[in-house]
Amino acid sequence: MAPTTVIADNNCNEESSNSFEMEIEAESAILEQIQNKMAKNLESAAYVPPTEEEQKAIDAKSVFIGNVDFNSTIEEVEEHFKGCGHIVRTTIPKDKFTKKQKNFAYIEFDDSSSIENALVMNGSLFRSRPIVVTAKRTNIPGMGHGVRGSSRGTFGRGRGAARGAPGRQQTVVVKYVYVNGPNRGGRGGRGRRFNPY
């Protein structure tokens, strides 16, 4: 009986090896995407907003930039202000509903001395538009604009407050009701008593 000769197919082995390597690369790419997504979620979950004092310190080193072109990029804004000092962070807020950029920005510098240099840029042309540069103000929680001009007349007389004006504090008028009526015939006005409401 003649011996059987087995010839190995090298092409099949190479194709199997290549297919296995492609599967490993694909799985590695998927795992990397998952890890990146988890890292972003952890970063957002670990974010702790600054305290009031910390926010004041940040704002003391920041400027507000108005009349910024809607298509501006952070890189372009930083390029325009790079000569003012070392920039820590540049923010162009977006509308929370439309997700479109607003027409203003904020720049935080490493040192408060850079603010004076940045204020010199007020009125300069950025994307062919004159921009407004001012020192950033710290927003104080609870200090809304609706209470301005309505402190007078809050108790009793009602002067200084617009009736029915939206967003303004309304005047509360306290009326007094005489229990037994004014005692006009009493001596020295005695007997005149009143209770609120």
UniProtKB/Swiss-Prot annotation:
The keyword RNA-binding applies. Keywords: RNA-binding. PROSITE patterns: RRM. Residues 61-138 form the RRM domain. Residues 142-166 are annotated as: Disordered. Coiled coil: none annotated. The lineage of its organism: Eukaryota, Metazoa, Ecdysozoa, Nematoda, Chromadorea. SUPFAM superfamilies: RNA-binding domain, RBD. It comes from the Eukaryota. One of its GO terms (cellular component) is nucleus. It comes from Caenorhabditis elegans. InterPro entries: Nucleotide-bd_a/b_plait_sf, RBD_domain_sf, RRM_dom. GO terms for molecular function: poly(A) binding. This is Putative RNA-binding protein EEED8.12.
